[in-house]
Design a protein with these regions (language model features):
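Extended terminal
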Residues: 8, 282-355
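Extracytoplasmic/luminal low-complexity segments enriched in Pro/Gly and acidic/polar residues
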Residues: 231-239, 245-295, 299-304, 308
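An internal, short helix-loop-strand segment that often contains or flanks glycine-aspartate motifs
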Residues: 56, 60-85, 134-243, 257-258, ...
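Single conserved position on a long alpha-helix in the C-terminal lobe of the eukaryotic protein kinase
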Residues: 45, 81-189, 248, 306-326
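Short, conserved charged micro-motifs
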Residues: 54-56, 120-126, 255-262
Length: 355
């Protein structure tokens, strides 16, 4: 009798344990939550900057000089991207496939983003209200409509650490992100392209990208027609295992396409490597040479698989030298609403001093 009484309890415990284990496994193979909140798109990019900082991939870097507009943003919100941003997920809408594509935007891609980090909500709301031409309310969330370069960027604070934005004309896009953020996170959720191909992303990847490739030069932001003769899907990822390991798979329609694509990519890399060795003086950078030496491209069934190992020293050099190439742009005429406001205040101060 005791065995019969205990049997249902044991079965119930086993069922609960199996359900929990299944949920954990599904969550491991599901895209990160910021990516699952994104709308349907032609490409997706995700970066886990929090893990990258903890892994100290780039090491100690010199101080980065800030653009005046960015410095104003930091002072107003207290948020510094290189310090406070933990996760970023980006959806890329190709021009031909954007729901709001028109004659004026035929060659311009559109983007939707979800950011996770250390956010001061009150300061960020105050900053967004200053920039917004209007504020909408949807499901208790405020949507800030910010005019920028002839378009409207819609921004919404989803939670204590999450912000979403989109520059698509359709207001339903940002509302869809808000609606998904208020539902219980499901490992089965997310855009169809991610649900289909995220399983190809290696486990513990710090960053990855999944995007469609069309041979037409006007189909996406980057023209791939010199490599791809037919449509394909690319899955790229980055992992850190003492060094940065990069892997990109171009999933094609068959084995012949994969072989031809591998040959074209291999020839392109050989030409690029030869050109780099020729222009480098007095000799090629050892980190760049190590990168090119590690490059491998080979067909695997219906895929062309490219792998490479990026030395940490090369990453440090790129990040350390990047500010030098952007600092001259700080003198360019401001085009965003932020500098126009600061410029207006400066003009008023000048008039006061003259009086």
């Amino acid at each position: 009798m005791r065995i019969r009484r205990r049997l249902p309890i044991v079965l119930a415990v086993l069922l609960v344990a199996a359900a929990v284990a299944l949920a954990v496994i599904l969550r491991k193979h599901a895209p990160p939550e910021p990516a699952r909140l994104l709308p349907a798109a032609d490409g997706f990019v995700y970066v886990n900057l929090g893990w990258m900082r903890r892994a100290n991939i780039a090491g100690e870097l010199p101080a980065v000089p800030h653009d005046p507009d960015y410095e104003q943003f930091i002072q107003a919100t207290g948020f510094q991207f290189e310090r406070d941003l933990d996760e970023a997920a980006l959806a890329i809408h190709y021009p031909a496939n954007s729901p709001d594509a028109g004659l004026n935007s035929a060659r311009q891609p559109r983007f939707s983003e979800v950011f996770v980090g250390k956010i001061d909500g009150e300061r960020l709301r105050a900053y967004l209200r200053q920039l917004a031409s209007s504020v909408d309310n949807f499901e208790t969330r405020e949507i800030y409509n910010i005019p920028l370069e002839g378009r409207t960027v819609r921004v919404a604070i989803l939670g204590v650490d999450t912000v979403a934005a989109s520059n698509l004309d359709d207001p339903l896009v940002i509302r869809g992100i808000i609606g998904r953020s208020r539902k219980l996170a499901s490992p089965f959720g997310g855009p169809a392209l991610l649900r289909q191909y995220y399983k190809e992303v290696p486990f513990a990847s710090l960053g990855w990208a999944v995007f469609k490739v069309q041979p037409s030069p006007a189909a996406e932001p980057i023209g791939w027609s010199f490599l791809f003769s037919k449509p394909a899907t690319v899955v790229a990822s980055v992992r850190y295992l003492g060094a940065v390991h990069f892997k990109a798979q171009a999933i094609t329609g068959g084995g012949d396409e994969a072989s031809q694509l591998s040959d074209r990519i291999g020839n392109f890399l050989n030409v690029f490597s030869s050109a780099e060795s020729t222009v480098s003086a007095p000799g090629p950078d050892p980190d760049i040479k190590a990168l090119f030496d590690s490059l491998k491209i080979q067909p695997e069934k219906n895929r062309a698989v490219l792998t490479a190992t990026v030395p940490p020293g090369l990453i440090r050099k790129v990040l350390a030298e990047a500010p030098l190439s952007v600092t001259p742009e700080t003198a360019a005429p401001p085009v965003t609403p932020v500098p126009s406001q600061s410029g207006g205040k400066a003009d008023k101060n000048k008039k006061k001093t003259q009086n």
